[in-house]
């Protein structure tokens, strides 16, 4: 809903309030579609800000998946703004007037598909959340990303995605704001 480039604007209440409003508009405007939709959005859980993926269908938010691994090297400073899933104090989050599950290991069922979600950096760690999601029965993993562009990174990323898909015995859908 917002952009990864918001950086210090993530601490602005106006940005967070309007991001949640835009998210609720998306949920409401797709209520007549039988489509599982996943969008990224910064959300406040208690007093903690999370980089999250929100899954919704037919006007209902099904759950929120917080990012597990926050990079804090080179140009990445996510720990400055966000809280990692392992440090969250709640397992539910209120969006608008709806209380929904909040967990990095949620699985969403859509027809015959069991969908798991991870966010960008989560794929790059030794044991990604998608590995656990696959062990719990997910057969399709979505990764929401806003990865930067570096020479040679695309080939490495493509290889990483193919390897993780094979390890999980699952389809792996990688959607980035950049190339690919």
Report the location of each language-model feature:
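Enzyme catalytic cores with a strong preference for nitrogen-chemistry domains
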Residues: 1-180
